[in-house]
Amino acid sequence: SAYTEGLFYLNGFLYESTGLEQHSTIRKVRIDTGAVVQKIDLPPEYFGEGIVNWGRRLISLTWKSHVGFVYDLASLKKQREFHYEGEGWALTQDGKQLIMSDGTPELRFLNPETLQETNRIQVTLDGKQVRNVNELEWVKGEIYANVWETNWIVRIDPKDGHVTGVINLGGLLGSADQGLGPDSVLNGIAYDAKGDRLFVTGKNWPKLFEIRLKKRGEPGH
């Protein structure tokens, strides 16, 4: 039931960041039970956003404060801060660099050591900009991204920003979405590369889903 802003899978655990001022956290969660095994609170003035792992570090963004944090991955102790222009929405990595969304149609590429920007691409679908690109995940050479306030995950070519496919997750929650507010949108993608498992969730959602993708028209599984 967390206000999920960032999500990734690592070594059998989910790492999740949650938002809202005075309530933002980063936590390590058992994937089988949902039990929180480790947690830190962000300072109350910060609205937590996306997170990603890089080596022995965990890197996190904040929404409008222009500041991010670097933590020791094992202990979740803060090591340092870094700064960026604009808003911070989400992070992922491709094994060589970090990839950041900021709510615009652009994705930024960051040097994982200096955390300085090295490149940007425009996300487009059929020649039109895709706005509100939110939570990110690197999946089999593509960037998967939630589009805020939609049921979409778009698949983005990291070379040119072109959307190569759209995953429609409308109706995924079913009856479990009753009583959730308008802010409780799809947001959160995590990929277990070794097990080829794809997980999704949303803000305040009571469930995490493992999904398998099929092309439109294929029979269900």
Could you describe each region identified by the protein language model?
Residues Y9-N11, N53-G55, Q93-G95, W138-K140, ...:
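Residue-level detector of Asp-centered blade-edge/turn motifs that repeat once per structural unit
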Residues S1, K39-P44, R80-G86, I121-K128, ...:
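Surface loop/turn motifs at the tips and blade-to-blade linkers of beta-strand repeat domains
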Residues Y15-L20, L58-S65, M100-T104, A145-E149, ...:
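Conserved beta-strand positions in repeat-built beta-propeller and related beta-rich domains
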Residues G68-D126:
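Hydrophobic, well-structured mid-protein blocks that either form specific transmembrane helices
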